[in-house]
C-alpha cells in the first residue's frame, strides 16, 4: 500500500536446500538484503531424549546457521547489514528440565557473537533477542493456562512484572536491533523477559 515490495513463501527451515533456495530467491526478488531475521524453533520444549537433541540441532542450530550464512553475501553488499536471531531466555537462565531446549538455544549465542566480531569490519551487525514467556492466542502458554493452570499461575508469579510478554514487544526489540537506531549495537543478547532473570548481565 505504501510502495513497499513484499515476497513470501512457506519453507521448512529443517530442509537445508529449501531454506537456502528461499533466502537466495527472496534476495533476488527484493534486489538484495539489508536485514535477516531468524526466528527458528523445532518446539523441543520438555524433550530430553537423543531424538529431541538431534531435531534441535537440525532445525534450531542448522536452520539458523544456514539462513545466516546464505544471507551474508547480500548483507555485506548492503553496507549496513543486520542479523537478528530470536532465541530464548532459557539459553541464559536455568529453565528446569528442558535440557535439550536450553542447550540447543544456548549454542546460538557464541555463534552470533562470532559473527558480530568477524563481520564488524564489513558493516554487518549480529544480535540476539531472548524472549521470556510470551502469551498469544493459540500459543503454548494459552494451552498451559487451560490445561495446567497451576503451572501457568506459578510462571506468572515468578515474573516481577506479574505478566507474560506480548508478541509485539518481541517484534519491537527485533525492529530496534535491525534498525539504524542500534547502529553501534552488535554481539548483544537483548533479554525481553520483564526482569525475570537473576543474572547481573
Question: Where in this protein do the model-derived segments appear?
Answer:
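Alpha-helical segment proximal to the catalytic Tyr-Lys
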Residues: 73, 117-121, 183
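A glycine/serine/threonine-rich, flexible loop-to-helix segment
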Residues: 121, 134-158, 199-201
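Short, small/polar-rich loop/turn modules that mediate ligand/substrate recognition or access, typified
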Residues: 80, 120, 125, 185-187
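Substrate-binding pocket helix/loop in short-chain dehydrogenase/reductase
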Residues: 44-57, 155
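Active-site helix of classical SDR
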Residues: 68, 104, 112
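Residue(s) in the substrate-gating loop at a strand-loop-helix junction
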Residues: 88
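Short C-terminal tail/terminal secondary-structure segment
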Residues: 93, 174-175, 186-201
Amino acid at each position: 500500500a505504501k510502495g513497499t515490495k513484499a515476497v513470501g513463501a512457506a519453507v521448512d527451515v529443517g530442509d537445508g536446500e529449501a531454506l537456502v533456495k528461499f533466502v537466495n530467491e527472496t534476495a533476488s526478488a527484493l534486489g538484495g538484503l539489508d536485514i535477516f531475521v531468524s526466528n527458528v524453533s523445532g518446539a523441543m520444549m520438555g524433550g530430553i531424549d537423543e531424538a529431541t537433541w538431534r531435531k534441535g540441532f537440525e532445525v534450531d542450530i542448522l536452520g539458523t546457521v544456514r539462513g545466516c550464512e546464505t544471507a551474508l553475501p547480500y548483507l555485506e553488499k548492503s553496507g549496513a547489514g543486520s542479523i537478528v536471531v530470536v532465541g530464548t531466555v532459557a539459553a541464559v537462565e536455568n529453565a528446569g528440565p528442558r535440557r535439550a531446549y536450553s542447550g540447543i538455544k544456548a549454542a546460538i549465542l557464541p555463534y552470533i557473537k562470532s559473527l558480530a566480531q568477524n563481520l564488524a569490519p564489513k558493516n554487518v551487525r549480529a544480535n540476539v533477542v531472548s524472549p521470556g514467556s510470551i502469551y498469544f492466542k493459540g500459543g503454548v502458554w494459552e494451552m498451559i493456562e487451560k490445561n495446567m493452570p497451576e503451572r501457568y499461575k506459578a510462571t506468572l508469579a515468578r515474573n516481577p512484572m506479574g505478566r507474560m510478554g506480548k508478541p509485539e514487544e518481541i517484534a519491537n526489540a527485533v525492529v530496534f536491533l535491525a534498525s539504524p537506531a542500534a547502529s553501534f549495537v552488535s554481539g548483544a543478547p537483548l533479554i525481553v523477559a520483564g526482569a525475570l532473570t537473576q543474572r547481573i548481565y
